[in-house]
Amino acid sequence: GTEDVLAKYESAQEKNRESRTQLHLLKKEVLSKEAASILSEIIENNESNSLFSISRHYSLFSLDDLSTLAREIGPHIQKVAFLVHDPSHTVFLVSNGRIDCGKLVKENASIYNGKGGGNATLARAIFAKDEYVTTFIDLIEKHLR
């Protein structure tokens, strides 16, 4: 009867909660490993005195996940790191603030019909097409040389 349906519903809700918790913990772990990977790449580049900027592409993380990742690595980025969310053609520009990411987006995204904004340490630019993302990143990298 009704109690049976209610019990099944509560059981499904509990399984849902457990799955969401597990997903959250997995994402947190994977984001932490990705941050460590980016930071070790930064250390290698600093040791080789490379002027190279880091650019990584993602399709499984959400925009919120990339924002979290950006905040974690930001203080360690001397130049600019580009975190690209491929499904939405969104580029996060991340830095320690020495290079103003918000200003770079405001001054350059519109060249490729992009929109966006942000502050000195974190900004995002959203484009209509994937090729605009690549061209935008190339432009910013040349601008920073």
What annotation goes with each model-predicted range?
Residues 1-145:
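Terminal appendage regions of diverse proteins
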